[in-house]
Amino acid sequence: MLSYLKKNLRSYFSSRVLIFTLAIAAIIFACATFYVISLESKNFSTIIGFLLVDLAIFLILGVLLTQKFFTQNSNNDSSKLQNRIVIAFSLVAAIPTIIVSVFSVYFFNLSVQAWFDKKISTVLDQSVIVAESYIAEHKLQLKETALAVAEDLSDMYYDLIHNPALFTKTLNTEAEMRSLDEAIVLNKSTNTIVANSYLSFSLSFATIPAHLIKKADLGEPVEVKSDPTKIRMLIKLKEYNDVYLLVGRLVDNKIIDHIDATNGAAAEYNSLKNEIDNIQIKFSIMFIFIALLLLFVAISFGVIFTAKIVKPIKKLVTATDKVKDGDLTVQVPENEVDKDEIGTLYAAFNRMIKQLSRQQRDLVIAQRAMAWSDVAKKVAHEIKNPLTPILLASERLLKKFSPEIKEKEEFENYLKMIIRHTNDIKNIVSEFVLFARLPAPKFTKSELVYLVKHIVEARKLLNDNILYKFESNVDQFDFMCDATQINQVMINLLKNAEESIEGRESGKIEVTIDAKDDFISVIVIDSGKGFPPELIGKATESYVTTSSKGMGVGLAIVKRIVEEHCGILDIANREEEGAIIDIKFDLKKLDLKVGRSGG
């Protein structure tokens, strides 16, 4: 019964009905949330509750849709491993997101209440009041001082009006006695300064607003706010005609900055306090969108991360299937993966397939060589026997009957043609025999530079139209080898190079010996026609040739001799005309082989 219920519940929760139900619920709750937010009298707790429900529904819906999507993909022969990892990423992202959302909103609400506590508001308000009281007190004192100075100057009108020097002296005395930082008497009619204290700055009526002058005409001191670092009062002198007194005191910059900072902080605090409900709602909405974004980022990251792991494995499986079907040319791209365990696996797979391919190729070549070796022995025996009498008979005919034949030149041409082709056949048979009976090398110490240079000089004498060049980075080099076989290798390579230059007025062959560390290379470069691209990969196979004079066993013999001497034969075409053949001997391996064979 329990298993039945479990099965049915699982079927229900993975069905489309639940997804459809959640989608309808998401629409309903989204509309309800919008309605609650749009009300004039907002209830923050209700709005937060609706937003949290919206978040939970969207997260669950996202997880179910993701699971449904990958379940359908798995039915389409997609990777089950990839689906499991993505679903795990989704769940791991969704559950903590819901928990963190609830606690974040709760703690944010507590923090906001702490920020806008009544005590903090009271302290800020008191600070503003104290700052304003300080300025107000200074203004009141300056106002009283302005009235007192104006009274004194009015009383001395007759003494001062015609004596500017006395006027200035009296004004300075008043300023000093009453601790004024500046005192200026201005004439409105002439727009001139009648008198001023020593530390006063020049000032004109142009800098004083007209409405303040009209206000001062009423007989009361008026504050002039022309400089934030000073408190100034303007008052009209009673006995004088259009004459005004301006007095001022400096306020400490630190006090002004402190007052400005206090007022700014209080204004900003009250502005935030008035907007707190909107801030809380905006924060909640923002957090929900961030939570949803994080969820979808986590799912996307899961898809990308899983694809990065599963895709290389899929390629490896595909390549393995091809190998199983007999394709040993398949390789997995190592440059598409990181240098981690997957990269190591790719490299190992490629090495393994290359080794299998090489072993298969070597096996085929060995089987072919063995078959041709048997054929060569029989064919050589069957052909060589009649060749000798044919050749001898042709030579005797040429000697004996040449004087008696009327068409002597034509007769000689025919016989020479027979002799030449007989020699060609004889050379082919010799190649057959050499390939079939190539003996094991007899290793002795030989001076390689002398050996190669001697062969180059000999070939140079036989080919006047070819420029030979020999270079070596060592003067001499003792080399364990079969000198006869190495001699045969060099002759074969140089003959091939000469044949590729045939038909041209001139050519060039370069032979280089390069000794470096535990390797020594012999490189032959020619300016001939090179190898056809389709044959360059199998030029060393038996009976593959581009020449009409041979059977294609020359390079096959060279390769066998080089490999017997622990070397590698590399054949390539040059970018310009010609070919390059590089023989590279591994001296360490050669020493081990010679040591084991007792050579």
From Swiss-Prot:
Signal peptide: none annotated. It is a multi-pass membrane protein. Its EC number is 2.7.13.3. It holds the Pfam family HisKA. It is found in: Cell membrane. The keyword Nucleus does not apply. The modification Phosphohistidine is found at residue 381. One of its GO terms (molecular function) is ATP binding. Member of the two-component regulatory system RF_0427/RF_0895. This is Putative sensor histidine kinase NtrY-like. It comes from Rickettsia felis (strain ATCC VR-1525 / URRWXCal2).
